């Protein structure tokens, strides 16, 4: 699917408030359809596995699906699989071809603990969800949170490796979702903004604003992120019961406000500056939208802040 640039700019000029509301409603309908599929699977399993590449909005989407399920009377919990990361020993950690620790590898996850927790939840037993401290790059089980599923309760586990065979393959009855910002933006038949650029922009803005990461560092990591997607995430997309497009037609016009200043600050000697310049120029095609118009519960708030959901 591709959005049309002319239509986006026309809607912004005509009535940006109405445009944003319609886009958010379309996203809400996708959430509702996902909830339908999950409920139809509840008798088979209380576990939902939600996967997708970096910058897809997995966290917000998991929380919104859980919210929709609760609205329908089914208590639900969103669980970040990032908390199941293992504390890495530099001597045994998986490595990229360049020799750095490969944080995109599924070997960084505690697969055995996840396996035990899924089985325990399905039996109605209590588990202790671990806590991974990213600032210290270590797991702290003493900060874990208890979770037990009562009858007809659901746990949504979201993470980049949720559909990996070593996870989903061991629990084939679980409902499975794959999410990504998949839609390009075209001007007629000419590509103006790639879906992968949307995800890179989301991540760059979030990392800069909330993780203290300079955009040059995000760009340096992006090549390995994309390599990890092709090796560890995309091959399992076909396992999903639902493919969920998390792109929003209004996000590029909003992101102009946040992304352009930080993208333009990247040093000229950065090896990815060529692609970066293409991305910077692409924003010129879009009318801007005031970020204040973005709803507090919008998925975009996961990346720009000021939202009604709490992110850890």
Residue ranges and their predicted role:
Residues 48-50:
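Hydrophobic anchor at the beta1->P-loop junction of P-loop NTPases
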Residues 77-79, 86-136:
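Conserved nucleotide-sensing/catalytic segment adjacent to the nucleotide-binding pocket
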Residues 115-173, 222-236:
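Glycine-rich phosphate-binding loop used to anchor ATP phosphates in small-molecule kinases
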Residues 67-77:
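Post-Walker A helix-loop "phosphate-sensing" segment adjacent to the P-loop in P-loop NTPases
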Residues 58:
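Conserved lysine of the Walker
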